[in-house]
């Protein structure tokens, strides 16, 4: 079974468990996004670059309030695709501090309406999904409880 077939199987399991997120992990350059794109192509799933979620309407919201409105605004955008399975690429776009988005909460809320699949741009440490700022300080730490983790082998 190749990596795309393996991922398809994991996503199909996630679809059966409504309210699930599939996180694809792997080293930088391991092909996380490539596998997601290929799976999206095979199954005709909706592939969304997270940069497309950052609309002028979102940016017009006062920075401190963006985290409150992001889940509903993003769900509305994703609903316009009329798809059950959503591939979110470039997740790190949502980590920008001025957006004030709690990515963990966002993915959990979106997963109530869609099966969310995304590549994790960071690493796993002590069982948590972690992402560091460019200066090397830890920026995000998320418990993967309730998420399906699938690792790309390089």
Model feature map: region roles:
Residues 1-17:
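N-terminal pre-Walker A segment at the start of P-loop NTPase domains
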Residues 35, 39:
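Hydrophobic positions on the alpha1 helix immediately C-terminal to the Walker A/P-loop
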Residues 24:
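Hydrophobic anchor at the beta1->P-loop junction of P-loop NTPases
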């Amino acid at each position: 079974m190749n990596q795309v077939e393996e991922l398809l199987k994991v996503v199909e399991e996630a679809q059966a468990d409504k309210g699930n997120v599939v996180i694809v992990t792997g080293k930088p350059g391991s092909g996380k996004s490539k596998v997601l794109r290929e799976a999206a192509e095979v199954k005709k799933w909706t592939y969304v670059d997270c940069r497309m979620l950052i609309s002028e309407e979102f940016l017009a919201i006062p920075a401190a309030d963006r985290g409150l409105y992001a889940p509903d605004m993003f769900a509305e955008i994703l609903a316009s695709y009329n798809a059950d399975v959503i591939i979110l690429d470039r997740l790190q776009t949502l980590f920008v501090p001025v957006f004030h988005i709690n990515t963990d909460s966002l993915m959990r809320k979106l997963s109530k309406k869609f099966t969310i699949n995304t590549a994790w741009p960071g690493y796993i440490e002590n069982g948590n999904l972690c992402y560091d700022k460019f200066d090397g300080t830890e920026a995000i730490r998320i418990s993967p409880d309730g998420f399906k983790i699938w690792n790309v082998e390089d």
